[in-house]
Structure formats: C-alpha cells, structure tokens
Amino acid sequence: MIQVKSTCLAYLAMAMMVLASLAVKAEDEMKPFILASVSSGNIADQLDGVKSELGGKGFEVVGEYSPYPTAHIIVVTNDALKKAAASHDRAGYVAGQRVTITRVGDEIQIAYTNPVYMGAAYRVKADLSAVADSLREALGADKEYGPEEGLTAEELEKYHYTFGMEYFDETNRLASYNSHKEAVAAVEKGLAAHIGGTSKVYRIDIPGSKQTVFGVSMAAKGETDNKFMDESFIMNEIDFKPLRSTGHLPYEILVKGSDVEALHGRFRIAVNFPDLSMMGENSFMNIMPSPDAIKDSLTLVAGGNLVDDF
C-alpha cells in the first residue's frame, strides 16, 4: 500500500512538473506583432497623432510609405535600437521597427513589430524590453498577435521554418565592394534609379559599426513585371487573418562592411509568418518563386550580378 501511494505521488509530482514547464514556456512565448488599438475612421486621421506620440517617447521617424491603399507604414528607431544593432555585425536588421496603420473593412488597426521578438530572431545581444515599453506607452498594447502559438527566445535564435530552409545567418549575398562607403553609395544609386522595381523607404547608419540598413519597397511595375517580387501580391497571399501583419514590410538591405546582403526570403517571410501552411490556399506554395524574385530585385539594386542558385 505504501509503495502504491509512493508511486502515485511520484507520477503526480512528474505531472505537476510538466504542467509547470508548459506554463513557463507559454509565458515566455512571443509573437511578432503587437496590436495597439482598433478604431474607426480612416488612415489619414491617425497619422499625425501616431507620429506625435512616437516622437514624445523618443522615437525618430526614419521613413514611411503606403505599400497599398489600405496600409501605411512608419519606420522608427531610437538610441536603444541603434545600440542593439551594433551588438554584432548582422544585428543591423533590428534598427528599424515598424508602426502600421491598416484599414480592414470599417476598422483601423494600429500595430507595431514586437522589438523583443525581432531581437531574438536576429540574435541581438541586448534587452529590448525597454523599447517595447516605450512603444506601449506611446501607442498602447492590446495583445501580441501573428501565429496561433508564439515562439520563445531560444526557439527564435535558432529558427528556421522546416528542414532545408534557411536560418538567420544564411543570407543572400547581393554584391561586394572595396569599402563600406562605396557599397552604401552603390545601394543609394540603385534605389534612386528604382532599379528592380525598388524604392527607398529609409536608411539607418549604425553608430560604432560598419553597418547601414536600408528599407526597400518593391513593386512590379514598368520594366519589372515579375509579380512574385511585388509586396502587394505577396501580402495578398500570406496576410489574410483578421488582424493584419502589415509590419512584415518593408524588406531590408544590409551593408555589412564592404558587402551587401539581405535576409533570405525563406527566413524573412517565415519568421513573421511561422504558422503559414506549406500547401493549400494562402500558403508558401502560392509564393514559391518569391524568395528568388526578391533576391533578384535586391541584387540588381545593390549593383550585383544575378546568379542562379541551382
């Protein structure tokens, strides 16, 4: 009898430990986007107020644009983000956080990227919770959203969508130059000429680091008629949930020393849409050519040469 009770107690203790570990994991899980508020009206009515609140909390607006009529994206940075971006030689991607105003039906959704999530995904060696707090104080924080289940910092640091898909550090090398200055000038020149269907959204130079990150919009127009690089087409396929993940845009080019690179599309898309299905309606299958099409446009604007992967 004593042995039976001891066995039962042991199983009960194990069950409690499992439940406790699951609770801790759920508490530590993060999602890529944070909903600030939902209101009525139109996008234009919200713009000045949002930018004023951001400025009041020390954020600098480095760029903004409307990728399509129902969305407006404001890219911000501050000293803490720039410092975090200098924590390693590929951390520049975290420097610009997106604040989005999106019309969905009669609703206006104001949201922003989760800097703590992005910091973990980009392996940043800094605590960005204070940045998240400042965004919350400026705009509000109703809830995190995106995938059904979040990811922990540990999972994000080694994230890839599935076997054979790229990790954070498996980037697309776009071009190489003799110096950082020359590389930056080449990207600026390409963006000014809208090569590859691109336009410049922002530029952030990372203090204390030979990193410069550009935000790049992409549209299939003029001589660039490949719909698979067009951000409107891509978002129409993958951003279909009631709460829109507009802050996925824009894509980035990072000048890292004298080299020019971009995150691989199969990582860049997946880390913001980790529960996107592989096949079916609204799936990766529908945008299968997009990672290569994005790479080609970014390579052209960086002054590089197109090279087939296979």
What are these regions (language model features)?
Residues 13-14, 24:
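Cleavable N-terminal signal peptides
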Residues 110-151:
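Hydrophobic alpha-helical segments and helix pairs
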Residues 72-114:
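Mid-chain, structured segments of secreted extracytoplasmic proteins
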Residues 210-310:
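A cross-kingdom marker for long, charged
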Residues 99-100, 203, 250-254:
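Short, surface-exposed beta-strand/loop micro-motifs that present aromatic residues
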Residues 2-12:
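Bacterial N-terminal signal peptides that target proteins for export
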Residues 27-68, 122, 143-218:
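Terminal, regulation- and interaction-focused segments at domain boundaries
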